[in-house]
């Protein structure tokens, strides 16, 4: 696995409460420092405003703090270098013309640590860097797509192909999404994060090298097959008749 820019597509018929919970956890869990973290939301215009309102309200309730504090909801970036990367991308988003809805700063009371408030941008176009490049922090970009075809076009437009999710109640939309999305893992009505040890893990395009981790595929990747013939019968002629 070599990077990701994972999207959640939210269609007009989606359960918005479930979608918001999934996006929230996928984006801000582990401070967004997961290869499968949600960093893009591609939403239908009929429901985008309601979805964004939910996401902003949930993000603003997150309590920042030490990972050793059980009352904390989200910890810091892993180190100063990564914190600087995240803050630089927030600056890029502002410069590109995206609308900062919440977050984007380090709280004044937390200058001692590499903390970043949960950050949500709206009005993000597929040409913007914050839409295309991996940030690896608690930053979410929201983009409007008028149809499933357009949503898939936007989702597939980046160089990465790790994981994507869709929220919809339409089975035809689900199957079209599964067939056409260019990622190694797909989710339906659940977060982009998470995996199972018995299932292959990995991506397409610049995300991976073509092989998968875990499951039988992972075993095959990390091992070599050796064919062994042993004649334990004590009969020399038996091996000649094989």
Indicate residue ranges for each PLM-predicted region.
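Conserved C-terminal structural/oligomerization subdomain of aldehyde/semialdehyde dehydrogenase
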Residues: 9, 63-64, 74, 90, ...
């Amino acid at each position: 696995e070599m990077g990701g820019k994972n999207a959640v597509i939210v269609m007009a018929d989606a359960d918005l409460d479930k979608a918001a919970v999934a996006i929230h956890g996928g984006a801000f869990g582990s401070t967004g420092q997961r290869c499968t973290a949600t960093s893009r939301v591609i939403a239908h215009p009929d429901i985008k405003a309601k979805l964004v309102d939910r996401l902003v309200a949930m993000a603003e309730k997150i309590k920042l703090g030490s990972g050793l504090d059980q009352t904390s909801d989200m910890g810091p970036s892993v180190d100063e270098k990564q914190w600087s990367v995240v803050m630089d991308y927030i600056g890029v988003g502002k410069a590109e013309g995206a609308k900062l809805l919440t977050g984007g700063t380090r709280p004044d009371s937390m200058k001692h640590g590499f903390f970043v408030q949960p950050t949500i941008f709206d009005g993000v176009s597929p040409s913007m860097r914050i839409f295309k490049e991996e940030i690896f922090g608690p930053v979410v970009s929201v983009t409007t797509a008028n149809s499933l075809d357009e949503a898939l076009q936007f989702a597939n437009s980046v160089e990465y192909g790790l994981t994507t999710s869709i929220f919809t109640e339409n089975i035809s939309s689900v199957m079209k999404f599964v067939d056409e999305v260019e990622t190694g893992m797909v989710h339906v009505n659940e977060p982009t994060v998470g995996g199972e040890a018995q299932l292959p893990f990995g991506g397409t395009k610049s995300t991976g090298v073509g092989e998968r981790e875990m499951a039988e595929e992972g075993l095959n990747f990390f091992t070599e097959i050796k064919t062994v013939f042993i004649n334990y019968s004590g009969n020399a002629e038996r091996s000649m008749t094989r």
